[in-house]
Amino acid sequence: MTYFMFLLLMALVVGLVAVASNPTPYFAALGLVVAAGVGCGVLVGHGGSFLSLVLFLIYLGGMLVVFAYAALAAEPFPEAWGSRSVLGYVLVYLLGVGLVAGIFWGGWYEGSWVVVDGLKEFSVLRGDISGVAVMYSSGGGMLVICAWVLLLTLLVVLELTRGLSRGALRAV
């Protein structure tokens, strides 16, 4: 399990570097999918299965807007991963991550990252699942507002990427 978590954390770093280097919107969207999926996998590995599921669904809603932008912002000659500028950014980011990891390497194993009920022998309910009732009772209105904001953002991105003459909403 330790090797699997190490692999997930390294994939998370690679996904975040792919988003930060941002060669074209296509590849940045792919890096965002990798980072979101692997980040939720790290949460599942540490026992937060419900939190991971909710965050991944929120990421999918946000990535819908990113995919709409990436599909409509087509470039005739997109920069790929092999171009010099993108490789320069990737190397700088990876060296920065390596430098920061080298500085803070000692002492990372002194703490423990455990879910609230992870130390109990027999637990009927998990700590992250008991938050479902609170999320839907107290936060139900906020969930509806967030859904409408994501829809509005999607429509704004679709309208802005088509220009003034032919809007995406007029074509329907």
UniProtKB/Swiss-Prot annotation:
One of its GO terms (cellular component) is mitochondrial membrane. The chain crosses the membrane at residues 1-21, 25-45, 53-73, 86-106, 140-160. Its main location: mitochondrion. Its EC number is 7.1.1.2. Pfam families: Oxidored_q3. It catalyses: a ubiquinone + NADH + 5 H(+)(in) = a ubiquinol + NAD(+) + 4 H(+)(out). InterPro entries: ComplexI_Subunit6 (IPR050269), NADH_UbQ/plastoQ_OxRdtase_su6 (IPR001457). One of its GO terms (molecular function) is NADH dehydrogenase (ubiquinone) activity. It is found in: Mitochondrion membrane. It comes from the Eukaryota. It is a multi-pass membrane protein. Keywords: Electron transport, Membrane, Mitochondrion, NAD, Respiratory chain, Translocase, Transmembrane, Transmembrane helix, Transport, Ubiquinone. Core subunit of the mitochondrial membrane respiratory chain NADH dehydrogenase (Complex I) that is believed to belong to the minimal assembly required for catalysis. Complex I functions in the transfer of electrons from NADH to the respiratory chain. The immediate electron acceptor for the enzyme is believed to be ubiquinone. PANTHER family: NADH UBIQUINONE OXIDOREDUCTASE SUBUNIT ND6, NADH-UBIQUINONE OXIDOREDUCTASE CHAIN 6. Belongs to the complex I subunit 6 family. This is NADH-ubiquinone oxidoreductase chain 6.
